[in-house]
Amino acid sequence: MAQSVPPGDIQTQPGTKIVFNAPYDDKHTYHIKVINSSARRIGYGIKTTNMKRLGVDPPCGVLDPKEAVLLAVSCDAFAFGQEDTNNDRITVEWTNTPDGAAKQFRREWFQGDGMARRKNLPIEYNP
């Protein structure tokens, strides 16, 4: 069963953080690429620490080995300097899909005792 094998690596472009630049009086969208560099099909889900300010589209999906997806990370308008942005980040969570599963994302892959991995991408806001 796929769950007994730890999920392999993914790559993100950018690799370590996402940067948004002022002004923040309008919505910004930044694209990141997620690449499945493992030899197994994975299911991925994206979480944000601030759902009011940050959005990701598509928020989840399935990637075959070596397949990539472009995600749109959006930052809604906000009052820069008046809101706490120190802990803002998005987290990519991924797991191997069960053998024989259809290429359609299932939330239950992340429930139970299956192994999942995470990669945090902090958000930096330039004034």
Swiss-Prot record:
Chief localisation class: other
GO cellular component labels: cytoplasm; cytoskeleton; pseudopodium
Positions where N-acetylalanine occurs in the chain: 2
The entry's keywords: Acetylation, Cell projection, Cytoplasm, Cytoskeleton
Tissue-level expression: Sperm.
Disulfide bonds: none
The MSP domain, residue ranges: 9-126
PROSITE patterns linked to this entry: MSP (PS50202)
Gene3D superfamilies given in the database record: Immunoglobulins
Pfam families (alphabetical): Motile_Sperm (PF00635)
A GO biological-process term: oocyte maturation
Subcellular location: Cell projection, Pseudopodium; Cytoplasm, Cytoskeleton
Further information: Around 30 MSP isoforms may exist in C.elegans.
Role summary: Central component in molecular interactions underlying sperm crawling. Forms an extensive filament system that extends from sperm villipoda, along the leading edge of the pseudopod.
Protein name: Major sperm protein 77/79
Source organism (scientific name): Caenorhabditis elegans
GN (gene name): msp-77
